[in-house]
Amino acid sequence: MGILGMRRFIREHELSVHLSIQMERGLYIPIAVDTWNVLTPIMRRLDPGNMMDPVERTLRGIMQVFSLLNKKSCFPIFVLDGGRKRAFKGPVKHDYHNIDHRAPTDGDDLEASANENQPHSLAGNAPRLASGARGAHQSSRRKTALRATPHYKLCWDLITASGFPTVYVKGMEADYGCANLFHTKTVMYVWSSDSDMVFMGCDVITDLTPAFPVAVFSKHVLEYLNMTQREFANTFVDCHTNLHSPETIYSFAAKLLEHRCGSAIDEPPAASEESSASDQQSADEDEHGAWSRYTRRPPRRADAAAWGAGPGGNGQLKGVSVLCGFPSDARPFDCAPARRRRLPQRREEPAARLKKNREFLAYMNSFIGCKVINNRHTLIKRVPIRQETFDPVEIYRILHEYAPTMANKWCAEMLVKCKLKPVPPLRDVAYGKATQINLC
């Protein structure tokens, strides 16, 4: 899920920054955690050969997440969506009363595993990907995917028993829950590698592992492109991978070129079979790869004036000290390879595409946009949050249920390495001590 090509653009134009965080003792940074988006790459790094037991791999991943959050003095709100991977889906009517924020059951665990690689559409009109040879290829990866699937019920139980707040939005995307928490000022950042968070106007921490975490600020991206948030959303909604199929989607670079030129690009570039395969591989890597992967490649400088960056594009947010500057060296625009300006392989009816885009933006705005109450008050309704007290006995019981012989060792290791302790209520952090945070 995300905006096709946005991560590549942010990497090449050096729009990500490193933050130095200095916290006073007892203060926390409220942060929303896109749980599966963060946990899955960590589990892959812990067990690249997929040889570890699924329960142990899930536990090790959770312990590493807890340890990172503790080192950075973060107060996390874990957002979970059931773990189902959905390919393309149209917008649906949103109702907060239908959000099932209760604890997931074992049925959800099995459902998530069974649907890990199966396309799903909420609107019922999305194209199916698993057909012909591609369907056979997906079925061949099924066993590996099921073995790599984390235990969602185990994750939920350990998170709640540790006393951290949770948001469970079954049947919906966790990204929208994270964006809602950010725009309601419940959290200051979102920990996720999904470019869709930047599309929704959130300040994102893409990698919390380094001593100086990597972050992307939506305000910096908008100032660099000299766009408003509304203009940015209306332009790049054509690049959303959850809304458009691979045959009808634009890349970020292609849509930006069309926006700068002021006219649509009618003909896709001609390419041989070899170049098409290279393009597809590049698109897959750009869409599914982690942001940390791009940091190993040599950066390319960009010309801010060529992209229309207005005055103040290199400014810094209050309270945050950026450890690297924004690009200033020139790079000709037309030197970008044509494969990075990916055009749709199949044209849609303009009216139908425009209608679908507007419905999706309205659906997204229902999560992060303001609503008028009683013709007087304007507010954004927050998703329901659940928080329980820290219970080490419950942690032991959970581990004993999944691994009776290793429960003592894992429980002691989890309490010591993660430095678990009673956490303050969310209200005290979000509305009290959070105002005293000093980031420099």
Swiss-Prot record:
Residues covered by region (Disordered): 98-144, 265-312
- Source taxon at top rank: Viruses
* UniProt keyword terms in alphabetical order: Decay of host mRNAs by virus, Endonuclease, Eukaryotic host gene expression shutoff by virus, Host gene expression shutoff by virus, Host mRNA suppression by virus, Host-virus interaction, Hydrolase, Nuclease, RNA-binding, Virion
> What's its EC?
3.1.27.-
Question: What spans are recorded as compositionally biased (Low complexity)?
Answer: 266-281
Hydrolase among the record's keywords? yes
* EC category: hydrolase
Major location (coarse): virion
Protein family membership: Belongs to the herpesviridae VHS protein family.
Q: What is this protein called?
A: Virion host shutoff protein
User: From which source organism is this entry?
Assistant: Psittacid herpesvirus 1 (isolate Amazon parrot/-/97-0001/1997)
